[in-house]
Amino acid sequence: MLTRQQKELIVEEMSEIFKKTSLILFADFLGFTVADLTELRSKLREKYGDGARFRVVKNTLLNLALKNAEYEGYEEFLKGPTAVLYVTEGDPVEAVKIVYNFYKDKKADLSRLKGGFLEGKKFTAEEVENIAKLPSKEELYAMLVGRVKAPITGLVFVLSGILRNLVYVLNAIKEKKSE
């Protein structure tokens, strides 16, 4: 059992984390073994290092920490056993994908992913799947570069064609004058 002082430290720590995090995802973890949760944590650690954590915290402590971090509308997420995923560094969408796919692979009820906050905006359990299907930031950057690059490549091709035609015309004029 935690002492009051330990609980206050947890609330203070979680409040500071929630103030700077880009993602908070609440999940029901019942039915998973310790080995399962260790596997999930190692997948997150592999991708994010210390930038993401999946942590089991008492609802009363989460409630106080979220209140201190000035979040609103989180009460519905704090029913039943709750684990919290938070991301402080890296792409938050990728973390949602990791957890979503983990629950899917373990054949867990996906509605147990309760919802949370992405970049400060609240999302529900129904929206977790949509977020998991979004492209990552890296994929979005690649798509953007491809879209920007395509017209430039086309322009270069057109301009080189015009220059090539100009060279052909000049060669034809030169040959005609030399006759």
UniProtKB/Swiss-Prot annotation:
Record SUPFAM superfamilies: Ribosomal protein L10-like
Entry keyword rRNA-binding: yes
Q: Write down the species.
A: Thermotoga petrophila (strain ATCC BAA-488 / DSM 13995 / JCM 10881 / RKU-1)
Q: Does the keyword Transcription regulation apply?
A: no
- Whom does it interact with, and what assembly results? Part of the ribosomal stalk of the 50S ribosomal subunit. The N-terminus interacts with L11 and the large rRNA to form the base of the stalk. The C-terminus forms an elongated spine to which L12 dimers bind in a sequential fashion forming a multimeric L10(L12)X complex.
* One Pfam family cited in the UniProt record for this chain: Ribosomal_L10
Q: What gene does this protein come from? A: rplJ
Q: Which GO terms describe its molecular function?
A: large ribosomal subunit rRNA binding; structural constituent of ribosome
PANTHER family with a match to the protein in the record: 39S RIBOSOMAL PROTEIN L10, MITOCHONDRIAL
Q: Which CDD domains match?
A: Ribosomal_L10
Q: Function of this protein?
A: Forms part of the ribosomal stalk, playing a central role in the interaction of the ribosome with GTP-bound translation factors.
| Entries under InterPro entries matching the protein | Ribosomal_uL10, Ribosomal_uL10-like_sf, Ribosomal_uL10_bac, Ribosomal_uL10_bac_type, Ribosomal_uL10_CS_bac
The processes (GO biological process) annotated in the record are: translation
Name of the protein this chain belongs to: Large ribosomal subunit protein uL10
Q: Which domain of life is it from?
A: Bacteria
Q: Which UniProt keywords apply?
A: Ribonucleoprotein, Ribosomal protein, RNA-binding, rRNA-binding
Q: Which family does it belong to?
A: Belongs to the universal ribosomal protein uL10 family.
